[in-house]
Amino acid sequence: MARSRGPSGCVLIPPSDLPQELPAASVAAASYGRAIANMSSVSADSLAERSKRGYVSAARTDQASKTRSRVIHAATRLFVEQGYATTTMRAIAGEAGVSLPTVELLFGTKPQLLHVVLDVAIAGDDDPVPVLSRAWAAEAQSKDDAVGFLSAVAQVLKEAQVRSAGVMLAAYEAAASDPDIDLLIADRELQRQRTASWIVDGILKHASLRAGLDRAAAVDTVWMLMDPVVFSRLTRHRGWSLERYAAWFADSIAQLLVAGR
């Protein structure tokens, strides 16, 4: 069919010659636009759902943490007041206001629960940060001399003794008839030795040991002075205040270990 030209010279295409379907590129563009719109809708829904799930998960985590804390506090009190051997997991669950299966799910066996109780009592919280990697240790090491270092350590030790000495005494009592607790006590004694070693090394950054005293003997001396039994006898049986205990600890180590004291 002949096609006429318009005034500007452009070829005029009759309507019958126009394509009845959009080119493939146009169809693809339209489909892509619809897909993007759908994706936006789905993405918004997914984000909302994920946000909701995250909120629920955070709430559950917080609740689990509070439950764990209640059980630890309940176990600590009962172990100290009633003794380890006579305190049952069921009694701990009742004291914490939770079910026995909940306690067993969170902690496993009674020896495992005692292990956690001691960790929390010594550190002061349930955070999985080693005691000697905490801020107080770095602060103590920043002191200008051995006396300042020992004074800072003694302040932290007295608080740890307040929290943990009673539980340790209950564990000592149970260890004689319970192999699991005996192993736990051995581990605690080793940890105390590591802390004593750290204290001696802290002293050596500022001063020398007394003549005739080697590092191993110095560590043993500090290890003994840190004994929770000693703390208990001085504060409970002899009526010492916590400040008197802390001052005695720091001064005793300085006099027994540091040259020139």
Which role does the model predict for each range below?
Residues 1-66, 133:
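N-terminal intrinsically disordered/low-complexity leader segments
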Residues 36, 41, 204-251, 260-261:
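Hydrophobic/aromatic-rich alpha-helical bundle segments in the mid-to-C-terminal region
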Residues 70, 74, 78-112, 116:
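Helix-turn-helix
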Residues 84, 107, 173-178, 228:
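Short helix-capping/turn signature of helix-turn-helix
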Residues 110-112, 116, 127-162, 219:
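Hydrophobic alpha-helical connector segments
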Residues 120-125:
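Short, basic, alpha-helical segments at the C-terminal edge of helix-turn-helix-like DNA-binding modules
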